[in-house]
């Protein structure tokens, strides 16, 4: 009971599907192997392929992205208390400072094109997660960008970002 997610990481690459890894913490966990009565179980057939996703910076779709990843860390704090009944259980599981970050990998045709997208201004990033699902990160800034000094045919670079938040994950 009282399950909250501690960390979640969502990523996608060319020729792949969206992948997610989540860590949950709970106030009380009961371990069992029995299935819930009345529930139905089936393999999930709705994997979201890379070509069903998108990344937008503000209102502009970024068509030079080859890989993307975002992380949400709630940094949960486990708070036990001394008590006689159920002393092994946590009393509280509050959220602490939420950390929002991620990384985009780009393939640019020119340094000018890279400079336009990687300008040092605050922005919103929207990640399409298939269908009408999306994750929107507000008040983002580029955190770490390394642009090669020599220009080849294509300019490949990774751009890390951090967001102040909030983040909205919707399916509307």
Question: Language-model features: where?
Answer:
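Signature of extracytoplasmic/envelope-associated structural regions
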Residues: 1-172
């Amino acid at each position: 009971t009282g399950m909250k997610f501690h960390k979640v990481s969502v990523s996608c690459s060319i020729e792949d599907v969206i992948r997610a890894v989540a860590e949950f913490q709970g106030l009380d966990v009961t371990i069992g192997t029995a299935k819930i009565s009345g529930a139905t179980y089936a393999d999930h057939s709705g994997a979201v392929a890379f070509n069903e996703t998108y990344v937008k910076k503000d209102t502009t779709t970024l068509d030079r992205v080859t890989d993307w990843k975002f992380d949400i860390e709630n940094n949960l704090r486990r708070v036990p208390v001394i008590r006689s009944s159920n002393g092994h259980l946590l009393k509280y599981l509050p959220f602490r400072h939420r950390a929002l970050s991620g990384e985009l990998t780009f393939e640019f045709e020119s340094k000018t094109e890279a400079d336009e997208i990687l300008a040092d201004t605050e922005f919103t990033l929207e990640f399409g997660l298939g269908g009408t699902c999306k994750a929107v990160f507000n008040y983002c800034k580029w955190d770490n960008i390394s642009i090669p000094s020599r220009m080849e045919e294509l300019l490949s670079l990774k751009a890390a970002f951090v967001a102040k938040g909030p983040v909205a994950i919707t399916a509307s």
